[in-house]
Amino acid sequence: MKMNLKPAYRYQFKNFLKGSAVFYIIMAFIITAFMVLSVNIGENSSINFGGYGLSVAIYMFVVGIVYIRSDLRLCLQFGISRRTAFLSELLSLLSISVILSIAGELVTASAQAVASGKPNVFVFDFYQLIYLGTDRVSPTFGQHIMSAFTNTSLFCSVCIVGMFFSLLFWRLNKFWTIVVAISIPFALNGIPYLLVKLGVNLNPLVKWIASSPFCFILTCFVIAALVAIIDWCLLRNANIKAAK
């Protein structure tokens, strides 16, 4: 099979872009409605909005689950190798993450400009909430750039993790699919409890990640790289079959 990276990337990018455009329009409408609502708010009341980054992260996680299977099947039908399909998928999700991050900064900055004259109206995003605080109404241009990098790393990592769950369930039979699906909530609650019982203190790691956006970005890309390797291991020998 040929290394047809360009056509595979073009198709997958367009596929990502269509859904992302609809999602962004919805988010822009929500933020616009929020700003319209804030116009008539009294001085004794306060209102805040800071959900763009986390909303996109959830969206990208779902995208990672949904798109990888159909994209792989279509690429193989057109004679494109699994390696090329996987690489083009990674490039597509990186491109969309960058676009959604920049677009998010634009709409957030616009909303912050409108709310600048109202001290009781707060518009902020993930980066500002962690590293600047909500009391700073208008981040600088450099801080918006850093926020875009932070969001890009977050969006990429959660999308690749979503791909992992999709590929994992793709490889499992029905019995193990049910077992793993039931085990996930128990693992999410049980592993932290087990770590505490074993005396493993994660607070230094959490503080290190929260100490600087560079630490956060590095952590996200390390997670993305490690999970991407696991994704490829699941994908390279998978039997191509319909989604469950």
Language model features with spans:
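Central hydrophobic cores of alpha-helical transmembrane segments
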Residues: 174-188
